[in-house]
């Protein structure tokens, strides 16, 4: 049995998040179908994280166990040749069998983009949130600094009941502004349910 670690990128506009759901098209469903086709066996991919409807991913990791001997480069080419234009496999490598995309994950980074202008930018409609009123960058930065470090984040989750611990570490919470474009970057060792959204 081989274990493959795969990195991919996707534009989430047309999908109801990553995780497979009944009666809704998801990234996992599409990718599993194409990966199974290339490996010539029915497989389940293990994603590093759930993403919500419409969320995009730049570097998303998944792992898959397979009996196939396909070389990693052939895997990348084969799957990319079958995927729609809004999903792309970036790389593939063989890893130890105990590697799991979710449980072996050391950190996650989220990027939120805001188009801060009176007028919408039609080229950014599904890539950034349009906010008309002026933002106080300094106030946002001061608030963001409070989250950095190791804290109990239960108050910033909509459900803490099934977690062994609600302690998480935020490595950075940065605000970058360039003209009308505001980028919020948050990196942590993990996030509770809805934690990133509530923060």
Task: Give the residues covered by each predicted segment.
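Structured-RNA-binding interfaces characteristic of tRNA pseudouridine synthases
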Residues: 1-199
């Amino acid at each position: 049995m081989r274990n493959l670690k795969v990195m991919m990128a996707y534009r989430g506009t047309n999908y109801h998040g990553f995780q497979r759901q009944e009666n809704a098209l998801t990234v996992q469903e599409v990718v599993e179908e194409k990966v199974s086709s290339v490996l010539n066996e029915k497989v389940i991919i293990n994603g590093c994280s759930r993403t919500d409807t419409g969320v995009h991913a730049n570097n998303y990791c998944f792992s898959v166990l397979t009996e196939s001997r396909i070389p990693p480069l052939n895997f990348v080419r084969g799957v990319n040749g079958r995927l729609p234009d809004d999903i792309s496999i970036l790389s593939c490598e063989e890893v130890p069998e105990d590697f799991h995309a979710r449980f072996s994950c050391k950190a996650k980074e989220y990027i939120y983009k805001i188009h801060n202008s009176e007028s919408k930018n039609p080229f950014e409609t599904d890539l950034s949130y349009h906010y008309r009123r002026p933002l106080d960058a300094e106030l946002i930065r001061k608030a963001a600094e409070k989250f950095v470090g190791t804290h109990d984040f239960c108050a910033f989750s909509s459900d803490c009941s099934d977690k062994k611990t609600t302690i998480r570490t935020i490595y950075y919470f940065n605000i970058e502004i360039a003209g009308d474009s505001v980028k919020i970057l948050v990196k942590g060792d993990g996030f509770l349910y809805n934690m990133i959204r509530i923060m």
